[in-house]
Amino acid sequence: MKAPARAAVGSRGIRALVLVMLGLLAILTFFPFYMMVIQATHTSEEILTTPPPLGPGVHSLHNYAKVVAVVPFWRNFLNSVIVSSSITALTLLFCSLGGYAFAVYQFPLKRVLFATLLGTMMLPWLVDLIPWFIIVTRLHWLNSFLALVVPSAVSAFGVFWMRQYISSNVPLELLDAARIDGCPEGLIFFRVVVPILTPALAALAIMNFLPSWNSFFYPLLVLTKAKVMTLPLVLNLLHGDPYRGMDYGVLMTATTMALAPVMIVFWLAARRFISGMTAGAIKG
């Protein structure tokens, strides 16, 4: 066999091996989600059988009825939508403005402020819990959405991310041309810069929406009333009595309902997310 033929065979073999590995990785990734959806259609007794059921059952409506009977699920669902959407919108606004300022303008102590901002990224997030809890308590924000939204309205990583993207993708000549035409600074940002930032904004939106939707520990500290709780706290209430056992079918139903919006948002914005991450990695 000639060298080119051997190289072609070796290339096809490597490609087949890569495809097999990717297939196995995909199965390992999605199988837990598949089991979650399947178990949402079974009772707890059926789930605990050996081997567990791998096909859909007939108790999905029964489990759903128990979920909405035990907790105000849809009210808590709306709470999560409001909190996560507010955090994401404010993060996009403030981080894009901060990144734009660091990328375009010159002002005193610019490097010092940016270095300080990056330094805060090295601190564990647990360090902020006690100061924020004290602030929220003194402002009488306990059991309100403000206690969740305000501390998360801006992130150091978001400012850094937008600053890097703007520095690499927004030409200063374009901004100068807009100023020559008499465009105010605010309109330059919203009409000239923001359309260029669409991939970066989409990526940042997903990176902030998912953690805010899944946040558990901090909301557990500042929310104690069921009517203002977010979905992760409600799922915790559905665990039931650990000594008498929990209803796994009900818990899996609520978990599936809670994860569905997150999966839909990610799938709809996946292309934007990938393009934003790729642009930031290549040009940043």
Predicted regions mapped to residue ranges:
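Short, Lys/Arg-rich, polar N-terminal cytosolic tail immediately upstream
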Residues: 1-10
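A structural signal for multi-pass alpha-helical bundles of membrane permease subunits
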Residues: 14-284
